[in-house]
């Protein structure tokens, strides 16, 4: 071995000796200081529920008595949450243990990670479930862009399709996007315009919609949307579901007091015979002080949308629609437990003597607007709904919400606001999400006046 190698070896050994010696000194000092600090601490006090291991028995802690009443009041809610989340947690444990998600993602995603195929499914009580596939692509239209195609089937009479394209990159202050939708269902629900009735019926819809928008974000908190839309919607008698007859047997034309089956009365169901064919332009403003919209965040949210629609073909209607929303999320504990309060309202204003098509009227009874009632069961010229919702985390990327709604439907310009009945519903929902999109949600809601239990579950691709 050369002299230079011996010198280098000796120098390395000496440096190693210094490191080991220094580490031993530091460890010894920490042990001494730790022993001194422990010697200065008073012994555990059993009267305060303290133990020698430093823990405090919750049952013996003074705060335990104060929490007894809230725990008792929340016991039914906690039990319901546990019942709903139990299968989800069991499934989550199985998925995590066997790496099911990673395997499925790898099998349905291209090697670049920006394109892939995902399953989608939706189910709501009293409606046919749908299932299909969604293709997503964040590469073809350019870096940060989005291309999505969705197709779902229920049966031969239920079909949904969607094609969405956003060529602009995420994060730009100006965004543009296009969307094409196709919907064919024969189990749509209608029970009249005005207060919910017992004359429940089903109708079929065959609709094609083309939508485009330009979105400006001058600041992080403010967004401005300019949108255009054209649609063709055709209606027909539906399939008897849950004992609800086709619409032509319920809201029919009467001659000499007798119902003429399969001929829908246009006075009771405006636009059914002509269809809803329109061109629409919209302007929307959104103010959102929350950092992100889906994860629990405190802040203020306000929105205003005004659109104008003009019919074509057999649809001669012309009308404005106005939507407003105000909400606030209050931080109850560590930014993860929130109380969300919001009020939202819709109204339409016809500009001629042609009634607004029934399908374009404001409705309540939807996943995000009084889900305790049949979808579209509360319908009129204007609607107003107030919601109180409590949200809290239950698992990584998942949260639960307990909500109560109070709302109603009214005639033009809310003219009968004081005299019309309002409706209550309560519900519980579990949501699995990313920072910007729901992956899966499941919930149960109950409509107090005239409604019933409504169960919904759904999932889609990111």
Which role does the model predict for each range below?
Residues 80, 139-141, 155, 167-171, ...:
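Outer-membrane beta-barrel strand-turn architecture
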Residues 109-282, 363-364, 376-381, 438-440, ...:
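Gram-negative/organellar outer-membrane beta-barrel architecture
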Residues 123, 411-422:
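Small/polar, glycine/serine/threonine/aspartate-rich low-complexity segments that form flexible
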